[in-house]
């Protein structure tokens, strides 16, 4: 495409020929490139604003939550692609099943992983939304859980009235946020208190087989190759969304049965001398616990190494 790539951030890459500078939420105002762009009068927009403007031209599906966003977004994109709908998608992780983390599709659907940091997800205009869970995260920006819940409430109210919001039914914080939704709401969980619920069946070897019920009526039976009960929950959200979109059951079943996950989301790096090495992006207490729990059925001994995901987030979560 002719794009020029540079790793320098000293302002030298900016020129008056630049039409627009797109910055992520993590770029601070003292960044040399950003300072130079502003000095030259170049238009500066946030990444989430660009994402929002692109979504306006299609039927938007936005997946939010403290954790599970990437996998759920990947599942939905994989299902839609399997169904021949050729969606546009932007996901926060590489997904081998669908050729990467982004794709400009010819279909009218746009799947986006909706990040809550800096309230970025409020720049999106989705017809369909998902909230997987709400927990303490990005405290360097939000300061407390109440402000996080409020932001998710704003997200819930942004879903178009003729759309659908799919939410985890066993999260008290989600229950507060979802009260501000103007659209239809469907819940999911692993018990029959929800609109969509899954019943995990014994299989072993990390494979998950589960029955799905919709409003107490049997819907179908599904298989997941990726381990972890949390991934059954992610799959339930994906099933609810894709059913609303109009995808047939067979396409959903085929896509989920072949789904291998996103890179660094419980990714098996290799096996040698009876040792399986797994790479997982887990970077807060709940995510770490879920990753370790997913390992336990696979081996009698689990050894974990933790790499802090930035100084600020780790400092706020050190007591946990």
Regions found by a protein language model. Give the residues of each.
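Beta-strand->loop->alpha-helix junctions that form or flank phosphate-binding loops
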Residues: 6-9, 45-52, 90-93, 182-204, ...
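Nucleotide phosphate-binding/pyrophosphate-handling subdomain across enzymes
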Residues: 204-206, 210, 214-320
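Phosphate-binding loop of NTP-binding sites
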Residues: 12-18, 25-169, 173-182, 236, ...
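Well-ordered beta-strand positions
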Residues: 103-104, 123, 202, 267-270
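Conserved catalytic and cofactor-binding micro-motifs
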Residues: 1-2, 212
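Short beta-strand/turn micro-motifs at beta-sheet edges
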Residues: 117-120, 199, 264-265
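Glycine-rich, highly charged phosphate/nucleotide-binding loops
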Residues: 2-15
